[in-house]
Amino acid sequence: MDFAELVFKRIDESWIKAQDYIEWANELLEDGCEAPSIWQLAACSSDVPVDPDEVERLFQSCISELGLELPSDWYTALCAYSSSICENMLQGSLLPWECVTEMLAIADDHNEPYIHWIWIDLVDDLHRTTVKTTSVHFYSTLNLSDPEACIRIVAHQFVSLCSISLPERFPWIWHCEVCGAISKENTFTEVNSDTCTSCGGISTMKNLRFFEHRDVFLKNRHSGSSFVAPC
């Protein structure tokens, strides 16, 4: 269990046990970490029974000694955890479909935030490609005949999205590439572009369920473009 998973389960108050902290410390020791606080926390495995209060105290010492930071809110912790899964896959520690399975499990456990719908849409499109349907493809700009390559590309985008502040309900929103206006009109549609009711731009309001529009959204954010009030 890596740090991102540990702290998410901690803040989510789900499945977290004193033994999880001890296993995390042992994994750090195996990776070559020699911080005294890590040794002390790992040594708690020999305690019968394990004292949860002592484990918590030592965990806080580890955080301080290693210069780590605990996320202040659930959403930040979730994004860090989800990103770490993608990064592990991109680094070769996870297989692409293992990453997808993890993302879908998170989406199933947590209906919101909607950002994990990026993965639900990808799996749906890959399935549509396999059965050769004519349904809308949110990922039609990718080579869907190479699923693992698509998964890696989407993982790169997902990590970038998790690193910035996103509008409420993202990606279930429309975003104007000209004026930055946001609309929460229905995104479950084959229409991927529409007229912006704010600036009047023709086909400038983009459905962010579509992969290519999220790429443009990211570029606009990195270039310093800002959002205006929802229309």
Residue ranges and their predicted role:
Residues 1-231:
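Acidic, Ser/Pro/Thr-rich low-complexity regulatory regions
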